[in-house]
């Protein structure tokens, strides 16, 4: 019978090397095996090319059966929530992407309450995550919290509309807002830059909190630092979306064909589509971390405070009931004591009368 050889643990050849440097590789393998989850919300008026842009970003068709409503249907139309989930795999890395669309936003004549449905949806996802996180089985929690919101701004105005301001202020403490100027091919380069500056000025004027890209670390390479600088300078992103392949300069590109030429979707000289996609991919982890550490924690703290106040009120009510019961008990004891005293006086009075009557006889 052969003797089994013991497992060999070999000392690293490099002096002073323990092996901790391999830990990131372990995390990477585990993350790749598990896959990634990301939820993107798109909000904006109809006709701004939201669906086309999302399909262009992820090279997929998320809305194959969508029916475009007519003008008459839009008059009384209410905001709906449509969540579409698709599994995307690229070089062995899986991404579970959920895109939350909001058809009907801004379509009705009276848009005063049109964003309440959207806010309720965001809060519901926080509430669901809090419930799952507090449960017994926390191993397979699906994260449907909204990590980023692309807010589409019309290129045909002179800046932000009152509805834009009201909506962004209503959600800026709940989700990461990335402002996007839609249909940038309707603007000249000068008009585009002027509109960007106007929007940024109004965002600052109304104290709207949009998503700010983190600064590049000092140890990052110069190319990444330059990329981060260009991405920051491009906000709000002015984009063009198209799923059509056309021929330009002897090659097939996605773009739009006009009598005066071709607008290429993925040409950074024509629009900010590539910059927007680069921002989303390179900062996807940061968007999730800000959602977890800032927006979700704010919701969780407020939720626990409300729960704490409820418990506190219940305790106060219980204390009040006990005090009232104790006061009622004291009143009854005092009443019984008075009755006993009266009965004792009556008995003493009766005994004295009987004694006087006996002496008289």
Swiss-Prot record:
The record marks 156 as: Important for dimerization. The modification Phosphotyrosine is found at residues 17, 211. The modification Phosphoserine is found at residue 218. Pfam families: Septin. GO terms for molecular function: enzyme regulator activity; GTP binding; GTPase activity; identical protein binding; molecular adaptor activity. One of its GO terms (cellular component) is photoreceptor connecting cilium. Changing residue 46 to D: Loss of GTP-binding. Residues 182-185 are annotated as: G4 motif. One of its GO terms (biological process) is cytoskeleton-dependent cytokinesis. Changing residue 51 to N: Loss of GTP-binding activity. Residues 34-306 form the Septin-type G domain. Septins polymerize into heterooligomeric protein complexes that form filaments, and associate with cellular membranes, actin filaments and microtubules. GTPase activity is required for filament formation. Septin filaments are assembled from asymmetrical heterotrimers, composed of SEPTIN2, SEPTIN6 and SEPTIN7 that associate head-to-head to form a hexameric unit. Interaction between SEPTIN2 and SEPTIN7 seems indirect. Also interacts with SEPTIN9 and SEPTIN5. Interaction with SEPTIN4 not detected. Belongs to the TRAFAC class TrmE-Era-EngA-EngB-Septin-like GTPase superfamily. Septin GTPase family. This is Septin-2. It comes from Mus musculus.
């Amino acid at each position: 019978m052969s003797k089994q050889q013991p497992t060999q643990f070999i000392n690293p050849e490099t002096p002073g090397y323990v092996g901790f440097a391999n830990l990131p590789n372990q995390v990477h393998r585990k993350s790749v095996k598990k896959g990634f989850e990301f939820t993107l919300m798109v909000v904006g008026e109809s006709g701004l090319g939201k669906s086309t842009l999302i399909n262009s970003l992820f090279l997929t068709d998320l809305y194959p059966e969508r029916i475009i409503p007519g003008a008459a249907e839009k008059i009384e139309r209410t905001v709906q929530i449509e969540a579409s989930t698709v599994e995307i795999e690229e070089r062995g890395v899986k991404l579970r992407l959920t895109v939350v669309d909001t058809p009907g936003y801004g379509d009705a004549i009276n848009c005063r309450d049109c964003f309440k449905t959207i806010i309720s949806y965001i809060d519901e996802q926080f509430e669901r995550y809090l419930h799952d996180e507090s449960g017994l089985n926390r191993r397979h929690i699906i994260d449907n919290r909204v990590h980023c919101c692309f807010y589409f701004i019309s290129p045909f105005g002179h800046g932000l509309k009152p509805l834009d301001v009201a909506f962004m202020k209503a959600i800026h403490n709940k989700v990461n807002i990335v402002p996007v100027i839609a249909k940038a091919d309707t603007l000249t380069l000068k008009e585009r830059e002027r509109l960007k500056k106007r929007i940024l000025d109004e965002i600052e004027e109304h104290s709207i909190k949009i998503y700010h890209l983190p600064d590049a670390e000092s140890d990052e390479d110069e190319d990444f630092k330059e990329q981060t600088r260009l991405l920051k300078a491009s906000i709000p992103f002015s984009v063009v979306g198209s799923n059509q392949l056309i021929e330009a300069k002897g090659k097939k590109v996605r773009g739009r064909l006009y009598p005066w030429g071709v607008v290429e979707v993925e040409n950074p000289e024509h629009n900010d589509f590539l910059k927007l996609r680069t921002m989303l991919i390179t900062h996807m982890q940061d968007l999730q971390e800000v959602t977890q550490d800032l927006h979700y924690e704010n919701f969780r703290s407020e939720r626990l405070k409300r729960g704490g106040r409820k418990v506190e009120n219940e305790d106060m009510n219980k204390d009040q009931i006990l005090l009232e019961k104790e006061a009622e008990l004291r009143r009854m004891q005092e009443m019984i004591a008075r009755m006993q005293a009266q009965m004792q006086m009556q008995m003493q009075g009766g005994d004295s009368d009987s004694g006087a009557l006996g002496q008289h006889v």
